[in-house]
Amino acid sequence: MKNPTLLPKLTAPVERPAVTSSDLKQASSVDAAWLNGDNNWSTPFAGVNAAWLNGDNNWSTPFAGVNAAWLNGDNNWSTPFAADGAE
């Protein structure tokens, strides 16, 4: 018997509300990093630093201490490793 409270299929379209600079200014616990001048941003909610890049839902989170931000689809990235200066 199927559970009627199951989440919708993953293939359903996902809608994200638009985030404005005004929204971010009002959120005192949000540390926003604006990337590429096109409203890309990342915030540390509950230990998750999700970077939404280029409006195509690409994102990264600090699993096992890794915080990789992939920018512009050209493999530029940054990490919080003290000795790592990879670009």
Swiss-Prot record:
A lipid is attached at W34, W41, W52, W59, W70, W77 (3'-prenyl-2',N2-cyclotryptophan). There is a cross-link at W34-P44, W52-P62, W70-P80 (Cyclopeptide (Trp-Pro)). The modification D-leucine is found at L35, L53, L71. Keywords: Antibiotic, Antimicrobial, D-amino acid, Lipoprotein, Prenylation. Kawaguchipeptin A contains a D-Leu and 2 prenylated Trp, whereas kawaguchipeptin B only contains unmodified amino acids. Kawaguchipeptin A is prenylated in vivo. Upon expression in E.coli of the whole operon, Trp residues are prenylated by C-prenyltransferase KgpF. Prenylation by KgpF is likely the last enzymatic step in the biosynthetic maturation of kawaguchipeptin A. It comes from the Bacteria. One of its GO terms (biological process) is defense response to bacterium. This peptide comes from bacteria isolated from a broom on Kawaguchi lake, hence its name. This is Kawaguchipeptin peptide. It comes from Microcystis aeruginosa (strain NIES-88 / KW-MA1-3).
